[in-house]
Amino acid sequence: IPVISEIEFAIQFTDAITVGITGSNGKTTTTLLTYHLLKQGGLNVGLAGNIGKSFAWQVAENKHDIYVLELSSFQLDGIINYKQHIAILNNISPDHLDRYNYDYSLYINSKFRITKNQTEADYLIYDNEDEAIQNWLKNNTIKANKVPFSLITKPENEGGFLEENNMNTT
């Protein structure tokens, strides 16, 4: 019998779009901000994952069209079939290494499980300046559309960047 995460369990009971957010730092802030923007935009959105009420509870009690999920590496490790339409990877730095036999590459792989089941119709938004993310993407293939963001440089193709204190997109 496979051991799955609560996220993997709950997704079986909803057809909602999910936005999954992970990273070593800034998950909660990014998740709350994303939820707030979607809610203020008039969308029927729920907030769950590693924040607030569990995703399973939300799915059982509410019928949201979209769920914004904060996802820890622990939750991502229990993913088998779950995928989100939009994955956001803030950054990766050495954290929880005791769980990964003190092997940073195992932790990085855990964070990239957020892309595991994505297709060409999905999106990965990621920090284009994060060395661990850049190295992993150079050596691995994902199916999702890659959308980098940067506070320093303008992405070559599609993405977001900071210029003259304004966030812009290409």
Where are these regions (language model features)?
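Phosphate-binding loop of NTP-binding sites
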Residues: P2-A144
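Adenine nucleotide phosphate-binding catalytic loops in nucleotide-utilizing enzymes
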Residues: N101-I108, K143-T170
